[in-house]
Amino acid sequence: MKKRSRRFSTLLKQIEADKLYSPLDALNLMKNLSNVKFIETAEVHIVLGLDPKYADQQLRTTVMLPKGTGKIMRVAVITQNNKTHEAKSSGADIVGGEDLIDEIKKGRLDFDKLIATPDMMMSIAKLGKILGPKGLMPSPKAGTVTHNLITTIKEFKAGKLEYKIDRSGILHIPFGKLNFNVEDLHINLITLQESIDRNRPQGSKGKYWKSVHINSTMGPSIPLDIQLLRNNYVL
């Protein structure tokens, strides 16, 4: 078992054992416990009653966080012809066609999101082993294969993010930075909750939400009361 630092152990003592916190109480506590010298990311970890080995229990979609993620997104676009100018004028940081595909083959990965037009996907398929493990492979489900570059680029720049369950049926989602005020973090968290409920897979049976915890990058995990979260509870 990994040994906890004295700093982390001290923070952990400030979380009441067996208590399920209201969303706002948890967010306030998370911010108050932060004592590092950089701006931490706020993360939520949600255990769902899904078994991802079944096709009808997969959960992968996108959501637009109203208050953004707090992260400056570097967006790359693979396209060609007249779409190249469209991508550049819409704010893409990197734009290319076959030339960019070749650069990625050689190791270029200085971007956070890769968007592509459908006509480039056959060429991009050869990058699967490079992009797949890093979660950068464009796909229609992730909203990153599109003809509508203008809207897609602007949305990802503004705070749109993709989330999907891991092999254990757990979601791990960043929903802001600790320099956000509590109200803005709460709005983003509720937006995530509504998206997860709205996109419940058809094959989901029994209890859908099993547990919810939030934490900052270097902070301890704080358990949330699921019902208060799903009722859009405001103290």
Swiss-Prot record:
PROSITE patterns: RIBOSOMAL_L1. The keyword RNA-binding applies. Keywords: Chloroplast, Plastid, Ribonucleoprotein, Ribosomal protein, RNA-binding, rRNA-binding. GO terms for biological process: translation. One of its GO terms (cellular component) is large ribosomal subunit. Transmembrane segments: none annotated. It is found in: Plastid, Chloroplast. Gene3D superfamilies: 3.30.190.20, 3.40.50.790. It holds the Pfam family Ribosomal_L1. Disulfide bonds: none annotated. One of its GO terms (molecular function) is structural constituent of ribosome. Belongs to the universal ribosomal protein uL1 family. Part of the 50S ribosomal subunit. Binds directly to 23S rRNA. Might be involved in E site tRNA release (Potential). HAMAP family: Ribosomal_uL1_B (MF_01318_B). This is Large ribosomal subunit protein uL1c. The lineage of its organism: Eukaryota, Rhodophyta, Florideophyceae, Rhodymeniophycidae, Gracilariales.
